[in-house]
UniProtKB/Swiss-Prot annotation:
Keyword DNA damage: yes
CDD domains: TOPRIM_recR (cd01025)
Described function: May play a role in DNA repair. It seems to be involved in an RecBC-independent recombinational process of DNA repair. It may act with RecF and RecO.
Family: Belongs to the RecR family.
ZnF (C4-type) ranges: 56-71
InterPro entries in UniProt: DNA_Rcmb_RecR (IPR000093), Rcmb_RecR (IPR023627), Rcmb_RecR_Znf (IPR015967), TOPRIM_dom (IPR006171), TOPRIM_RecR (IPR034137)
Protein name per the record: Recombination protein RecR
Domain of life of the source: Bacteria
Keywords: DNA damage, DNA recombination, DNA repair, Metal-binding, Zinc, Zinc-finger
Signal peptide residues on this chain, from the entry's feature table: none
SUPFAM superfamilies for this protein: Recombination protein RecR
Residues in Toprim domain copies: 79-174
Length: 197
């Protein structure tokens, strides 16, 4: 490509997760066609959000203040925690409108191959919240990967001595999915997580 500035813009956009080069080109061309005022507003919003969003000092989620809205809400179930890998996982769980407790973000999972152990995660902070916040149940919502499962097992071993119910989100066949298309791991997990009817 002859235009180096455009190429640099495409490279920057395609470094974002889920955006390939083709999408990066489309976004770049769209941004170049924007009216200058609209473009400036877009850039201002990106910069403003990046500068003002921080991490909640209590749960580790994204927040505009020291403590996020979920942690300060009096409408939430204060005795139930949902433990997630990353702050963005909270957004997806909240969209289900099924969980009404509070959260705790680990900032990753145990991964010996990547040199990440329990001390590299926010597990100590989780354990320190249990007694003062009178937590009765911890729902572990790590991803259904080997690392996510190892992290869930480790959390259970640390939490059970504290007289806390430790639960795990169920995994299985996608609604509308087919057993023949499910991989062996997912199908096995669905069988182990079966429910009483």
């Amino acid at each position: 490509m002859a235009n180096h500035l455009l190429e640099e813009m495409v490279d920057a956009l395609s470094s974002l997760p889920g955006i390939g080069r083709k999408s990066a080109f489309r976004i770049s061309f769209h941004l170049l066609r924007l009216e200058q005022g609209h473009f400036n507003h877009f850039i201002h919003q990106l910069t403003n959000t990046k500068n003002k969003i921080k991490f909640c000092k209590r749960c580790g989620s994204y927040a505009e203040t020291e403590i996020c809205n979920i942690c300060t809400s009096e409408k939430r179930d204060t005795h139930t925690f949902c433990v997630v890998e990353q702050p963005e996982d909270i957004f997806f769980i909240e969209n289900t409108r099924e969980f009404h407790g509070k959260y705790h973000v680990l900032n990753g999972v145990i991964s010996p191959l990547e040199g990440i152990g329990p001390k590299d995660l926010r597990i100590k902070e989780l354990l320190e919240r249990i007694e003062p916040e009178q937590i009765k149940e911890v729902l572990v919502a790590t991803n259904p990967t080997l690392e996510g499962d190892a992290t869930a097992d480790y959390l259970a071993s640390q939490l059970k001595p504290l007289s806390v119910d430790v639960t795990r989100i169920a995994y299985g066949i996608t609604v509308g999915g087919s057993i023949e298309l499910a991989d062996q791991y997912t199908l096995g997990r669905a069988i182990r997580s079966r429910l009483q009817l």
